Amino acid sequence: MSLVIDIADTIVSLTALIGLIITLIKFHSQNKEDAIMQIRKIAQEEIVNFLDTDKFKHSIIDIMNESNVNSKVNDIDSKITQLLAILCYTDSKLKDTELCRSSDRSK
């Protein structure tokens, strides 16, 4: 499996885990908004750190060197769609955005 697909799988898995944590906190925390904001901050920092890694940078180079770039792009698009579906379903603020409503991914 391509390094790029491994990375996309990792992002989707991480997002699913974050969504689960947010959902659990919503039901068990008295100060839900603070907890959710803290998890969003952590998730954002993790994504920024991930984008700065050599592994990610090398995966972009791998995409450019692939003979079947369209197939790789379609695989990545599929993973991003999964990621968006998870985010639209788990994040109430995101559910109300045009992105989630127009794509109907939140249902």
UniProtKB/Swiss-Prot annotation:
Pull the Extracellular topological domain ranges from the record. 26-107
Transmembrane domains' residue ranges: 5-25
Where does the UniProt annotation place the signal sequence? none
**Principal subcellular localisation of the protein:** host cell
Which species expresses this protein natively? Acidianus filamentous virus 2 (isolate Italy/Pozzuoli) (AFV-2)
| Record-level GO cellular component terms | host cell membrane; membrane
UniProt entry tagged with the keyword Transmembrane:
yes
**Which segments sit on the Cytoplasmic face?**
1-4
Its record classes its membrane topology as: Single-pass membrane protein
Task: State its location(s).
Answer: Host membrane
Q: What is the protein's name according to its record?
A: Uncharacterized protein ORF107a
Write out the entry's keywords from A to Z.
Host membrane, Membrane, Transmembrane, Transmembrane helix
